Amino acid sequence: MGAPSITISFIEKAMTAVTRGERGIVMLWVKDTLAAPAVNPVTVVTEKDIPDNLKDTTVEQIKLAMIGYTNAPKKVIVYCMGIADDAEKAAIDAGYKKAMEASETIKFGYLAIPTVETDQKAQDIATWVKTMRDVKKKKIKAVLPNTAADHEGIINYTTEKAVKTETVTAKNGKKTTVDTEYTTEQYCARIAGLIAGTPMTIACTYAPLSELSDCTRLADISTPVDLSL
């Protein structure tokens, strides 16, 4: 008599897991500062939640992460590292260290850092993610630019250039076509959001990036796929 209840329990747990997996949480670490009384990190569920004082580049990254795929991410958590654009290495190191410490107790699934390659921190983040997963059992993943996917917690994104074309309407009604070009590190937030918005029941391998008009194209697709790139 006990077997049916066990089977039902497994089915219910599986259904719950699928539901939980429909919308993941993205975390962004950005070189920006939140003005009081805002609390760092800030949680963004809709665009209305984006603080007014953030840099345009930060806002753009948040919006990229929020696009998602089948679904939008459940939310985007934005941690402002307080690092100036022209900061020295010591300040950059300190900012990243604080971000790591703060993120250890925050629930999220996918991490992206729009300046991680510029800051020369990709390998440090890869090491941190591996430690979080293997030692502290926090099953997070990071989307990193041009970083070997030698661990299940590392998602290697390598496309050199992605171009978004959109039509902007001025106050006088004049329409202008504007191209926005993203480097590899700048588009990692989009990839993190896409994966977070992919239900467990489907794959995102060939997910369309409908906002793009152009990107760096591969002459040979087999080698990157074989290498999980």
Regions found by a protein language model. Give the residues of each.
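Short, flexible coil/turn micro-motifs enriched in small/turn-prone residues
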Residues: T16-T19, P41, A192
